Regions:
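Acidic, metal/ion-coordinating pockets
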Residues: 2-201
Length: 201
């Protein structure tokens, strides 16, 4: 059992009872001074559809290709959580959904773990001059037209310089709210983003 830093004995039961009492007391506060919640009549409301497409754990798969077997992954490969995969397939789906919904009615996001996982991304990190200098996943994501991407833990596998090469080559904002630059004390990249979309109603 840990020592109580307050120097007093406080049981869990007493703490819960006190918290409950404080919570009930707060509900009795006079709210007459508060601004009324504005209401909107049904006649002024309109609806619109916003489609969010998100990818995660791409792990360097630009194509649905097994570089070690030099062949496409079989559709029912039991070693994978889903089949098929690859940014090339994502691009096909994104193009189709944008055509159906309207391009500005679609938000395209990636949740990270992107720049590591295949011989292609290894080559991009270790010998970029062999692939035209651009980070390969940034190039692929730029062609798909992502609106934003997040940093995953595997973005650090090849070092900070490679992470920032991806960041600099990526046209979409790269977001991360929980990694701080120790030199500046500031977030490594921007932590959030507001997107403006003109959604057809």
């Amino acid at each position: 059992m840990h020592d109580n830093p307050l120097g007093t004995s406080l049981s869990r039961r007493a703490l819960l009872a006190g918290s409950l009492g404080a919570g009930l007391a707060m509900t009795a506060v006079d709210r007459s001074f508060a601004s009324p919640i504005p209401t909107v009549s049904d006649s002024t409301l309109s609806t619109a559809a916003l489609t969010v497409l998100a990818t995660t754990d791409i792990h360097g798969h630009v194509f649905d290709w097994d570089y070690f077997a030099d062949a496409a992954f079989p559709p029912s490969d039991k070693g994978r959580s889903s089949a098929p995969l690859g940014v090339s397939r994502v691009a096909t789906i994104a193009k189709q959904v944008r055509a159906e919904q309207g391009a500005d009615s679609v938000v395209m996001l990636d949740n990270g773990d992107t720049i590591q996982g295949t011989p292609l991304t290894y080559l991009s990190a270790k010998q970029p001059d062999k692939l035209g200098h651009d980070e390969v996943m940034a190039r692929a994501f730029n062609l798909v037209g992502y609106d934003a991407a997040n940093i995953g833990n595997h973005e650090f596998n090849y070092g900070i310089a490679e992470l920032f090469r991806y960041h600099n080559d990526l046209k979409a904002p790269l977001l991360c709210a929980n990694v701080i630059d120790v030199k500046t004390g500031k977030p490594l990249t921007q932590g959030s983003l507001m997107l403006t979309k003109n959604v057809a109603g």
